[in-house]
Amino acid sequence: MKFTLSWLKDHLETDASLEEICARLTMIGLEVEDVDDKAAFKPFVIARVISAEQHPNADKLRVLMVDTGSGEPVQVVCGAPNARKGLVGAFAAPGTYVPGIGVTLSVGNIRGVESRGMMCSEKELEISDDHTGIIDLPEDAPLGTSYADYAGLDDPVIEINLTPNRPDCTSVHGIARDLAASGLGTLKTRPAPSFAVEGETPVKVRLDLGEDRHLCPGFALRLVRGVKNGPSPAWMRQRLTAIGLRPINALVDITNYLTFDQGRPLHVFDAAKVAGNLTVRRAREGEKVLALDTREYTLSPANVVIADEEGVESIGGIMGGEHSGCDENTTDVLIESALWDPMNIAKTGRTLGIITDARYRFERGVDPEYMAPGLERATELVLELCGGTAAKMDVVGYDGHEPRSVDFPVSEVRRLTGLEVSSEESVSILRKLGFGVEGSGERLTVTVPSWRPDIDGRADLVEEVMRIHGVDNIVAAPLASHNAVNGKILTTLQIRTRQARRALATRGMLEAVTWSFIPEGHAKLFGGGQPELKLANPIAADMSDMRPSLLPGLLAAAQRNADKGYGDVAIFEVSGTYEGDTPEAQRRVAGGVRRGTASLNGTGRLWSNAVKGGGKPVDVFDAKADAIAVLEACGVPMANVQFEAGGPAWYHPGRSGTIKLGPKIVLGAFGEFHPKTLDALDVSGPLAGFEIYIDAMPEPKKKATRTKPALELSPFQAVKRDFAFVVDKGVEAAAIVRAASGADRKLITAVNVFDVFEGASLGEGRKSVAIEVTIQPVERTLTDEDFEALTARIVANVAKSTGGVLRA
């Protein structure tokens, strides 16, 4: 939002300097982004060329004698094609800095002729890009005076960075209101427009929107006859130029001026070019309009237009049509002031790719109560600058604004901000901002003004009081220090999430972040696809469903790496999956995928390429080891964990497993992927993966503490004994491990399987499972008798649990 200092002072009575105004704007939340102060133009003066002779040594140069108003002519060498006797322009003396060329002038010698200054073009003064000739001013321009003063370039331009929730400050008047409320001056009030009206406006307006009346809640129209449309006055042209707008003609400039002055976008139609009455309606499919930017737009029923009997004349709230635009031949003009639905304006603007000052304001919300007064003010300016006779205003559809009231306890200011603001000051601030305030003491009833659609509740009112009172008045204070140990900062779920990440990274896996949205087919393949998990507005057709599992995204990521030459990858993710649309149906899961030879010691491990090209393909045991690593890192009691053969349908039925804690708690699953799953996802293997449900893990029995438990070490040497048991093929190795561990849980610290053998010598349907048992004495060195007794218990436990016998 741009405006000039003098423009602001049309609305604000203040003696504050430019620096004070900019500082206060930033303090009250209207951040000043840039200040363009043309004070550097002061040295440029208005001068007249009193003679122009051909340069003796150059065909394209002329030697000018220039009257700068000082009484003594100055010689200047100039190459501008329009340099001539009698021309009045802007002169720069030696020592003047010329911003357009970045040079400080000095007395020069050009092809043997001395030059003591420069006649400047608009580009050299950075007024425009025009450098075809030097500035050509009217003959009555006062010689010797500052060109900046004459051209209005002495007026600093302030640009503020508006947040979307402040539509009231898309006008100079709204900005002045905020400054006045902060104590920097007094807000000026303009008397209501007063002018004579004659007759009715013959062009009628019909709102043809059916049940979608919200698309155009109000429409006001007035005819002004007998106008003379020429250039707008210099003061208006200067202000529009200063903020980057191009003056066109008086009628158009008035609408642009009021857009910034009052935040009220308007539009003018040449009445002679409008066929019959106007209708506000949805555009028809494929309907076209040639807009004022000379571009043709193809419309759809999603767009709201203003049309006459022959077609579209304007894209409502965004841009008018070229056909009914006003030019120097316009004598009768229709002035329109309307209200438009912000959401529809935003969608139409994005769809058509049109950015205008009107769209900028309507999509944020304009003051509905200023629709008719804005038209009155525009009419007043048209009559003042263009003459003519105004007809009566015709208002259609507007039912008035229903003000909102907010119950406001004054103590909320202190509770939410820490500021001590008295009730009287809070009331004063709100009233200066235009709020209606009733009541006294602690509780107030505040009525929100029509120009503040962003105010919705108490917190918004607190913000208003805080920013006007001054954010810099908040006293910095350290947090209270209590001589006690801080409570637990992270939840158990957060701690376990961190532990899972570290454990998997330690195993050489790389963390990935995949989309939470996946194709519907992939979701159904992994147990999802429920209607409540479909996205209402997906960002892409293949991102339609919330994921029920991390594995589809990880498998796709692994395949993308393989397609680019990185086939041996090991990646993991710890994130959320979704079984329903309730908070309880969102799960925290640690999942991972290994591809190719990316086992723990394979090529997928970042710090070891020892077996590159000859590594063993990943299998179910790699995935199982990863899953166990997560469980151990999260503190799950592994002695109670059970592994069952078989997993979900997306795993290979004979090369997968399910991890349980008791009969009901499922901790996760792992395995190699089913060939049908890989085909459906269009990925190639070998691939193995796992998922661990972190939120299914039971809470630790011991209370969380920052203190690590004491490390208990035995002074006695650990002893390892090997056993080989012959069992039926259907017996799981885990059953043998559990049975051996149960022989003496105090002395036996680890049981590991190191060999499985099947052969004819063992008999039909039999196999040999070899285990290594680690025995750790605690209180004393064990005797041979102790080892023999423990060995007997191990053999007996395995025989009882599995029917296994020691292999001879």
Curated annotation (Swiss-Prot):
Domain FDX-ACB, chain residue ranges per copy: 714-807
Superkingdom of this protein's organism: Bacteria
Record InterPro entries: aa-tRNA-synth_II/BPL/LPL, B3/B4_tRNA-bd, DNA-bd_dom_put_sf, Fdx_antiC-bd, Fdx_antiC-bd_sf, NA-bd_OB-fold, Phe-tRNA-ligase_IIc_bsu, Phe-tRNA-ligase_IIc_bsu_bact
Catalytic reactions on record: tRNA(Phe) + L-phenylalanine + ATP = L-phenylalanyl-tRNA(Phe) + AMP + diphosphate + H(+)
GO CC terms of this entry: phenylalanine-tRNA ligase complex
Localization terms from the record: Cytoplasm
A Pfam family reported for this protein in Swiss-Prot or TrEMBL: tRNA_bind
Binding site for Mg(2+): D454, D460, E463, E464
The enzyme's E.C. designation: 6.1.1.20
Segments forming domain tRNA-binding: 38-148
Domain B5 as annotated: residue spans: 401-476
Keyword Cell inner membrane: no
PROSITE patterns: B5, FDX_ACB, TRBD
Cofactor annotation: Mg(2+)
Entries under CDD domains matching the protein: PheRS_beta_core, tRNA_bind_bactPheRS
Xref: NCBIfam families: pheT_bact, YtpR
The name this protein goes by in its record: Phenylalanine--tRNA ligase beta subunit
Organism: Rhizobium meliloti (strain 1021)
